């Protein structure tokens, strides 16, 4: 009886012990899960709230004596390039504007392009924050704020910047883009695939710029201007085992996989803002290329909803109008600025 009793008591104690352990384990598991959830929430917040990057840039300084404005600098101009581009693409239009408007012109490399830092995050929110950081850091938000100009992807960055920060800039010029969401551009994905093939060849069959250009021509077509532009996304590296001065292997200058991912996910084609919440009432110019389809007439009411003081200028060129006809682009911008500047 006593043994049975002791066994019963032990069994009861054992049950209590097991239950206590179960409670402890469940509590530990709960605490762990809560900690894990908190960690993921924090990671998500940190991912959403990216630290702005310090962007690479060139500056074309104004000649204060020639322009007659010593001690009274006019609002500067900031120019943003498009996808696959860099600050060098806008040198010609930048020099034109510098000469005709007599002010400093800043040519920026956006994140994951040119000489600017790389990041796994590539969307308009973070890119516009990078540019805002640049303006603030260089104290350009004086005298009414800079004139912001952007082509294609850079145009959406510029639009996002002024809509989110209405007092930051004095004027907007958007070249070949509109505040609309589109389907991801499959053509851009093919561009990246062709460039990655050149990189992955590692000098086996593609050893010169001519051979790289021929590969692009075979893969994406015959537009020489586009091919030349795309090849700036690669850098030549002299082959160690080659006696020929013109034999190279090619490496990525920009993170092609990151940009491909952003294109496929729709980050480049996206437009997340709503004119019911964001509007910009300062002067805005939209330059359209007549041989392109980026800013069709159907988009004009949407542009007007975001930018009620907008106007358009059409130029007979393709999508890369700023490179094809920099002089005509500059003339349109000069006319716009001179009419709207105080």
From Swiss-Prot:
Group of enzyme by EC: transferase
Keyword Membrane listed: no
Keywords per UniProt: Hydrolase, Mitochondrion, Transferase, Transit peptide
Listed GO MF terms: carboxylic ester hydrolase activity; transferase activity; triacylglycerol lipase activity
Pfam families xref list: Abhydrolase_1 (PF00561)
Keyword Transferase: yes
Active site (UniProt): 152 (charge relay system), 319 (charge relay system)
One Gene Ontology biological process: lipid metabolic process
Transit peptide endpoints, chain numbering: 1-38
EC number: 2.3.1.-
Gene3D superfamilies in alphabetical order: alpha/beta hydrolase (3.40.50.1820)
InterPro entries: AB_hydrolase_1 (IPR000073), AB_hydrolase_fold (IPR029058)
PTM notes: Processed by both the mitochondrial processing peptidase (MPP) and the mitochondrial octapeptidyl aminopeptidase (OCT1).
Additional notes on this entry: Present with 7400 molecules/cell in log phase SD medium.
Family: Belongs to the AB hydrolase superfamily.
Protein name, entry field: Probable alcohol acetyltransferase
Organism: Saccharomyces cerevisiae (strain ATCC 204508 / S288c) (Baker's yeast)
Higher taxonomy: Eukaryota, Fungi, Dikarya, Ascomycota, Saccharomycotina
